[in-house]
């Protein structure tokens, strides 16, 4: 004798009301013309009731006959079992037809047992032209055993904004939930859901919600103990332990970044930035910027900024004494030491036929004469 197949009570109860609930889809091919279709596909139907056929809910833009008295039918509908956490629906707008939808309500009526149902699509949008899945989730909280009622209210409209016949459809369903236990428990207000996974409140994370979340994160080995609060190790302080508490002061503009450690500006070194990298100090206001390297102010140059700069220079008869000030050798003068004393007299033209000695001025007379203005010098 053949053994009869055993069905769960949920399946048997669904089978008992199939004649008034379900219109099986006869044409499994492409939807004809331009219209709207919504159905539970064969795979999902098999999971729910063990019957592998498409179940039409909306056909050719109209609600299926079993939905006409849906409230009466759902009173006999069994609760969704513990092991079923979601249900998939498939919908499609065929041809060029445009349909719009809105989930007016997704609400748990027993919030201590189940949270509000979820959907994987925006609550307001357009029905796609390609067959797509809409998943409705039933999030049991895992806090207690019980049956939760929940409401799904959706309206579908055509391109003119008119609701299709018999929508909005306001349906009440029931979901069986059971208390869950998470190994190790859930801390800091987290709760164990029916999948035995801790769901953590804002600010906590981890397998047991044992870790607090600090933004910005705790630095330098700090420990986040509650959201936004760090315990800092010795030597550090600040909201996120980003500041070092130096026992000694950093000199010369140094910055403390770690207990006993200073970041020194260029040219300085030492634990407290007290040492210059230049063995001999920079002169004339220069600053040490590296090992034996000075940055000189304008007007000076050289390794120690000891050499003044004269522009364009003092020529062959002078030396630069101060910035843009030349010290000329004896017999030379001028800003750049390029003018010679007595040069105009020595090179003046002699009268024709005159003797050299007769018309050459004596040294005493030459010394007694005033030099002409520098601008009249020939050089």
Swiss-Prot record:
Highest taxon of source: Eukaryota
Glycosylation: residue positions: 88, 245
Stored Pfam families: EGF_2, EGF_DL_JAG, hEGF, WIF
Keywords in alphabetical order: Developmental protein, Disulfide bond, EGF-like domain, Glycoprotein, Repeat, Secreted, Signal, Wnt signaling pathway
GO cellular component, one term: extracellular region
Annotated signal sequence range: 1-28
Disulfide bonds: 140-177, 182-192, 186-198, 200-209, 214-224, 218-230, 232-241, 246-256, 250-262, 264-273, 278-288, 282-294, 296-305, 310-320, 314-326, 328-337
Gene3D superfamilies: Laminin, Wnt, WIF domain
Chief location of this protein within or outside the cell: secreted
Residue numbers spanned by region Disordered: 348-379
A GO BP entry: Wnt signaling pathway
Biased composition (Basic and acidic residues): 356-373
Domain WIF: start-end pairs: 38-177
Induction annotation: Induced during the differentiation of CG-4 cells.
PROSITE patterns tied to this protein: EGF_1, EGF_2, EGF_3, WIF
Subunit structure as annotated in this protein's UniProt entry: Interacts with MYOC.
Function: Binds to WNT proteins and inhibits their activities. May be involved in mesoderm segmentation.
Protein name, as recorded: Wnt inhibitory factor 1
Source organism of the structure: Rattus norvegicus (Rat)
């Amino acid at each position: 004798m053949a053994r009869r197949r055993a069905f769960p009570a949920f399946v048997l109860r669904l089978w008992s009301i199939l004649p008034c609930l379900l219109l099986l889809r006869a044409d499994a091919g492409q939807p004809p013309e331009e219209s709207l279709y919504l159905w539970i596909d064969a795979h999902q139907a098999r999971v729910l009731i063990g019957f592998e056929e498409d179940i039409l809910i909306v056909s050719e833009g109209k609600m299926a006959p079993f939905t006409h008295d849906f409230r009466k039918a759902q009173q006999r509908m069994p609760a969704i079992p513990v092991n079923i956490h979601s249900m998939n629906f498939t919908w499609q707008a065929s041809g060029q037809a445009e349909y719009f939808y809105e989930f007016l309500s997704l609400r748990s009526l027993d919030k201590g047992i189940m949270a509000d149902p979820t959907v994987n699509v925006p609550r307001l949008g357009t029905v796609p032209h390609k067959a797509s899945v809409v998943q409705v989730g039933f999030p049991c909280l895992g806090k207690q055993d019980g049956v939760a009622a929940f409401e799904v209210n959706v309206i579908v409209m055509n391109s003119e904004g008119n609701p299709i016949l018999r929508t909005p459809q306001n349906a009440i369903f029931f979901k069986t939930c059971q208390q869950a236990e998470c190994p190790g428990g859930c801390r800091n207000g987290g709760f164990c859901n029916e999948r035995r996974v801790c769901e953590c409140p804002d600010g906590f994370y981890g397998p047991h919600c044992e870790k607090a979340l600090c933004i910005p994160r705790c630095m330098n080995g700090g420990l986040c103990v509650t959201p936004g609060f760090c315990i800092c190790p010795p030597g550090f302080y600040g909201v996120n332990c980003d500041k070092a508490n130096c026992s000694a002061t950093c000199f010369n503009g140094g910055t403390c970044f770690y207990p006993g450690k200073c970041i020194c500006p260029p040219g300085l070194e030492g634990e407290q930035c007290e040492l210059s990298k230049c063995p001999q100090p920079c002169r004339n206001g220069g600053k040490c910027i590296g090992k034996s390297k000075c940055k000189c102010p304008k007007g000076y140059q050289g390794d120690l900024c000891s050499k003044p700069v004269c522009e364009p220079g003092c020529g062959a008869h002078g030396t630069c004494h101060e910035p843009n000030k030349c010290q000329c050798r004896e017999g030379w003068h001028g800003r750049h030491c390029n003018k010679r004393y007595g040069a105009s007299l020595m090179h003046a033209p002699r009268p024709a036929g005159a003797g050299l000695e007769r018309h050459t001025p004596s040294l005493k007379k030459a010394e007694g004469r005033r030099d002409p203005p520098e601008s009249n010098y020939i050089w």
